[in-house]
């Protein structure tokens, strides 16, 4: 993990809502370790001169869908292409300043681990896996002629769970698959 000191920047103070100068910021790996007015003493850190640019904490997107760009795509686009697309979306999010995202349905543990292991460049992810919905609910994207009783809908992006026992089972399955939270689309 790298160790960096950022200097020569306008530091955004998010509590006061102002830009401040004369500060240095020490980052180790993906963590801000120290923010100090004046010099930070860390001889093993690489110093990066930001040339007067603005430095701010990473943004957090609390409702993203990196795996499903359009729900209608799920009917005609294979999961492998959707995963390839998600790598582009994740990289673009980093470039826009997002360092953490909460994916609210679609992305799973494999997407999260692809970022953590460096296969994809992207922000830290908290994933929901498959969206839970009841038959005919907001997350049931099956076509009117689709009478599948397999509990999956929309290429596995959502899952149908009717009744308490089915919901309990669906939640346990999603947790078993490594999700960080459960997304429910009822109604």
Question: Residue locations for each model-derived region?
Answer:
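N-terminal metal-binding scaffold of metallo-dependent hydrolase/deaminase domains
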Residues: 1-42
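Divalent metal-coordination and catalytic microenvironments
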Residues: 9, 25, 30, 52, ...
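Residues that line or immediately flank small-molecule/substrate-binding pockets and catalytic motifs
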Residues: 13, 63, 105, 129, ...
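Active-site metal-binding motif and surrounding structural segment of the metallo-beta-lactamase
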Residues: 38-56
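Metal-associated gating/positioning segment near the N- to mid-region
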Residues: 53-117, 134-142
């Amino acid at each position: 993990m790298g160790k960096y000191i950022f200097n020569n920047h306008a530091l955004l103070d998010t509590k006061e809502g102002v830009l401040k100068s004369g500060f240095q910021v020490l980052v180790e790996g993906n963590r801000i370790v120290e923010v100090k007015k004046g010099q930070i003493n860390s001889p093993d850190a690489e110093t990066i001169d930001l040339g007067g640019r603005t430095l701010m904490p990473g943004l957090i997107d609390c409702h993203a869908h990196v795996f499903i760009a359009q729900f209608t795509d799920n009917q005609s686009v294979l999961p492998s292409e959707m995963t390839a697309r998600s790598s582009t979306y994740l990289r673009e999010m980093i470039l826009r300043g997002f360092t953490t995202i909460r994916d609210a349905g679609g992305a799973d543990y494999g997407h999260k681990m692809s970022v953590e292991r460096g296969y994809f460049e992207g922000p830290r992810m908290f994933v929901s896996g498959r969206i839970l919905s009841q038959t005919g609910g907001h997350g049931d994207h099956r076509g009117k002629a689709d009478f599948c009783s397999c509990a999956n809908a929309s290429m596995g992006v959502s899952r149908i769970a009717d009744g308490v026992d089915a919901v309990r089972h669906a939640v346990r399955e999603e947790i078993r698959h490594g999700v960080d939270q459960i997304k429910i689309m009822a109604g």
